[in-house]
Amino acid sequence: MKRSSMILWVLLILSPVLAQGQERPTAEVVGDLPTEMEGTSTLFFLDGKLWSCNDHGSLVLYALDTLSGNITDSIVLPGSIYDLEEVTQDDEYLYFGDMGDNNGVRNDLHVLRLEKAALASGAIAFDTLWFSYPDRTDSSARDFDCEAFVATDTALILFTKQWLSQGSSCYSIPKTPGRWEARRLFDIATEGMVTGACYQPERGRLVLCGYNMFCMPFVYLFDGFSGSDIVGGRQQRVELTNGVGWQTEGIATTDGLHYYLTCEHLDAYGITHPAQLLTLDLTAFFSSTSQILSHPTSRSFTIYPNPTIGIIHLPSQGVKAVAVFDVQGHKISDFRNQNSELKIDLRSLPIGTYVLRITCEDGQERGEVVIVNR
């Protein structure tokens, strides 16, 4: 069976979960991006224009028409990039994050800092902020990709893209040139990979964008905080209705309610999707603050270990039953809660990806992807 068919089976397994909760918004297509922008990796406003750039090759900034996605201007900067995934800014500087690390092998992660005034004068000179993660290990390296960061008054705040854990950890480094060890601040249960960030300290608001392992997009909202205390307010994860294949990469806004996103060209797993400029209206989610969860920095229950060599554990409280499916949609086994910690024995299964449909005591269902890897 083709990989795309497998993905559709998994989505059918998870469909009861996806249908629950507040009505999900849709990111509307403004237009396809030109071929020059197929590797779009970021999005930001500067001097009244919406800008993006690609994640590799020459460092060129492209201004996009917000009504069509067409290129209206460009700025060629000196040098080249390896995997530039985000551009952020403060009042004085632009920060270019060459910190993408899909395979967890880079030892040259860095941020290029450029004075905004240099764009007008043409005297382009970058400072470099080198950094590393002190808690990165060989086995966890793929959880230390990073495609989103923001600049506060005192530091750069990085949000990791976790290929293994499907969450994000937040780190900080100083805003000045040098060599730094990133300091871990907190973890976020994004249930997907974070790829972009839009920080609005004057509104006490931060919005992350990303997608899950099926390239289904989501945004993660922080709202109601003061200063740089990002976790001092409310948080909410919002899934979009766009479906499979939307590899969202950048996010930007001018009013804090209506957002622009870009999605990168995708041609993998039997899925082809063009690079596009999108719009997303989040007005209802910031108005209905009573529906925003307070500090959901961990899931309601934890499945561990994942990946596993055979046995995974779930707490008994809140869980009624668990069904195990393969990615073709075939049910493999059922487990019932016997008022003790649930142990799901997968030792008889071959190495691969499986889906758990978890039935909770309140009747709701949720899905979790587990990986058997020996």
Which residues does each PLM region occupy?
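Sequence/structural signature of beta-propeller domains
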Residues: 22-288
